């Protein structure tokens, strides 16, 4: 298998170090006559599927997918890999903990992706995307020591992804942001839900829409866990336009009622500018689902062009100052 991308890491602090849960996207080396891609079979073993490049029923117009007749597959299969760092820049595999998390079962036959990590009540909760021919949903795992992971299964069924947990209970309830995908009606909007136990979710509300003619006109989705500030819950989210250009923005939710949007970025706080952000496996993409906070310093770990992992630092106060210029509501 060939690694096509290392991208979209979850991030957290543990035992005095910065840790990332990387997404590793792989596929077989491509031959001259056939396109090939991996899936998991019923025994959780990797099986290689192939189609001839010149097959008229084959659609490879989007490098992320292999479409054949009435079926859609992923061109790569992803697993998760744990890395740690003493300085937040230079990362290595941990020596005393398992570092690889593979997909398994019939809900993860196309892999697992884009993990978000939330530390809450001494435990670490991992929400991640489960992909299979059954659709795209959200899975949940948790751990306290990063040695044993407890799998809770799928908590949001297809089609859903981009699930970020709030890092504490609010009025006795757990809250999560997530992104159901509208097919014919609705759209790729951000929703909020609440739960008593993190496994079963209800009181679903749509709280953020895409905005016509803006940088986030086609789809939006949550980044890492919301960050508590004096002004409200600060969330860094991604938005894309109809040309599939992904940027990052900020939104502020009410501390006591996180379904209420206080403010939202008019303009991106980050957009593809560097060559490695504009060109790659799937270019013009900056995408975050993990960060760490030290005082006013916010370090975003993000995927560039679905191929690389990068880091960028921001002032929390500076982001909040830009939001003070706006007042918004779901539109």
Which role fits each region the language model picked out?
Residues 276-278, 286-290:
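Short glycine-rich, acidic/polar surface loops and turns
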Residues 1-110, 118-218, 227-281, 295-298, ...:
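Beta-rich carbohydrate-recognition and catalytic domains
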Residues 113, 163, 224, 287-289:
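Structural signature of WD-repeat beta-propeller blades
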């Amino acid at each position: 298998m060939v690694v096509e991308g290392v991208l979209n890491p979850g991030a957290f602090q543990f035992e005095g170090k910065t840790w990332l849960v990387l997404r590793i996207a792989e596929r077989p080396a491509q031959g001259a006559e056939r396109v090939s891609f991996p899936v998991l079979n019923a025994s959780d073993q990797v099986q290689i599927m192939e189609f001839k490049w010149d097959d008229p029923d084959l659609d490879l117009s989007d490098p992320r997918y292999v479409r054949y007749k009435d079926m859609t597959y992923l061109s790569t299969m992803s697993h998760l890999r744990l890395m740690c760092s003493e300085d937040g820049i230079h990362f290595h595999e941990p020596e005393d903990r398992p570092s690889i998390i593979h997909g398994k079962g019939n809900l993860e036959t196309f892999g697992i992706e884009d993990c978000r990590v939330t530390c809450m009540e001494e435990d670490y909760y991992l929400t991640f995307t489960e992909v299979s021919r059954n659709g795209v949903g959200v899975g949940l795992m948790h751990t306290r020591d990063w040695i044993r992971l407890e799998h809770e299964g799928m908590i949001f069924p297809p089609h859903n992804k981009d699930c970020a947990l709030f890092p504490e209970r609010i009025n006795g309830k757990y809250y999560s942001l997530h992104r159901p995908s509208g097919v014919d009606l609705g759209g790729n909007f951000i929703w909020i839900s609440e739960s008593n136990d993190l496994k079963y979710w209800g009181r679903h509300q749509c709280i953020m829409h895409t905005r016509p003619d803006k940088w986030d006109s086609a789809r939006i989705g949550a980044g890492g866990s919301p960050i508590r500030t004096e002004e409200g819950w600060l969330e860094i989210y991604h938005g894309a336009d109809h040309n599939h250009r992904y940027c990052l923005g900020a939104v502020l939710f009410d501390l006591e009622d996180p379904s209420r949007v206080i403010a939202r970025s008019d303009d991106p706080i980050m957009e593809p500018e560097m060559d490695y952000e504009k060109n790659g496996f799937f270019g013009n993409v900056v995408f975050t689902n993990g960060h760490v906070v030290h005082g006013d310093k916010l370090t975003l770990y993000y995927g560039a062009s679905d191929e690389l992992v990068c880091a960028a630092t921001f002032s929390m106060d500076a982001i909040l100052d830009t939001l003070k210029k706006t007042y918004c509501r779901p539109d």
